[in-house]
Every structure is written in structure tokens, then in C-alpha cells.
């Protein structure tokens, strides 16, 4: 890890320690285990695909390290409703504070305002965060292969599965993909953005998807901005996408989704 990602991880470790000091692991785990009825994230994606529609994980993100503030008029509940009304399969909510100006309350607000399953998008390093995710209502969590070793990925996935949460494991290169395929989750996110440099290329998905077994569901992440991008990926057999920035900059995020993916 280098540069931006290394900084994010260092800050995240401090945040986790502070969170545990405020509320111990045993208490957070009890809260998580008392939650019932997750919304089925994988089924929501598969349902769209089975109907011949693009399965879009629509992201709620106020800011990013590379682009700064994406949306000043930022009301997560309204954005979530707009996404749901315009054909999104699921939501992704950024909860990292320091680098993305997110928070857990944004996830709670988004989930309360619509029926869609919600992914907590953050930098997961510790079991505490998985329990925290379920306690705040998340239906799925993101695991980033670049910041976790094999044992950590398997442990965090096992905890998520024990809480009936889905896991989206994110990769950027062939070695990371090989490691991700050791997990049980069917969801493999190929991030076209290099988290070490924040450079983006859709060729990342087109190259790595050749190594993906048929029983896994590929989610194309980052770099989808135009209808041509969607058509290019669709022609290659990609039918699930995670998109945020393109929608966050639009006056109506849900309408932007419908126009980009022709879901209207």
C-alpha cells in the first residue's frame, strides 16, 4: 500500500480504536446480533439481471479524495428515494468521515427512506466494523483485497455471513482476484480505479473478467460516466455496476441513473 490508501488505512485504525473505547466490542456485537431481517443484496442484483436489466448499485457519496466535494445539496434520504424510483437494484453509502465526508448516519437515513438493500462502503480492517455495520442496518459490506491479507478477508467474511450480510470483495489486479476467489461470496467487484494512484481505466474490468468463474457475479466499479461506457461494458457481458460520482454531480441522481442505464 502506498500514498492515499496507506493514509486512509492509518487513519482508519485510529478511528477503530477510538470507536472501541467508546463502545466495546461485546456491546457492539450484541447490538449487531439483535438486528433481524437483512434485505437480500445478492438477490436484488440477480433479480435485475434475470429480468434483462442492468443491476445498478447506486452510490451515495458526498466527497472523494481525488475530486473533492461532489455534491453540496446532500440529503441521503432524498437521494436514496430518487435512486429507488429510477431503477437502482441496491444502494452503496460511503461512511468514511475523514476522506469521503461520510458517516454511519447517512447509511441509516438512506436505508430508512427506501426498500433497497444497502452496502456499507468503507475501509474494513477489523471485526468491530463488521458488527458495527450490521448494528447500523447495513445489508452488505465491502472488503478491499488491497488492504487485507487472506486470513483477514476470510475472518471478516465469516462474521458478515454469520450476521446474514452479503460481502462484496473488491479487487484491482489478477493476484487480488485470485485471493478473492478463495472466499465464499459470489460478489466480485472489479475496481477500475487504482486505489494507490486513483487513476481509472475500464480496461481493468475487461481484462480481469476473463479469469472470473461463471458462478461469480461481477460488479464493475468506477469509471462509468457515459452511455458509451455502459454499452461497452454490456457488450463484454458486464451487467452489474457500482456508480456514484456520475450521479452525485447530477441535479437529480435518480434521473441520471435512468438516463445512463436506460432503466426508465
From Swiss-Prot:
Enzyme category, top tier: lyase
* Entry keyword set: Amino-acid biosynthesis, Aromatic amino acid biosynthesis, Decarboxylase, Lyase, Tryptophan biosynthesis
Q: Which reaction does it catalyse?
A: 1-(2-carboxyphenylamino)-1-deoxy-D-ribulose 5-phosphate + H(+) = (1S,2R)-1-C-(indol-3-yl)glycerol 3-phosphate + CO2 + H2O
GO biological process terms held by the UniProt record? L-tryptophan biosynthetic process
For this UniProt entry, the molecular function terms from Gene Ontology, in alphabetical order, are: indole-3-glycerol-phosphate synthase activity; phosphoribosylanthranilate isomerase activity
Transferase is among the record's keywords: no
The pathway it acts in is:
Amino-acid biosynthesis; L-tryptophan biosynthesis; L-tryptophan from chorismate: step 4/5
Q: Which PROSITE patterns match?
A: IGPS (PS00614)
Pfam families, A to Z: IGPS
Q: What is its EC number?
A: 4.1.1.48
Note the HAMAP family from the entry: IGPS_B
Q: Which family does it belong to?
A: Belongs to the TrpC family.
According to UniProt, the name of this protein is Indole-3-glycerol phosphate synthase
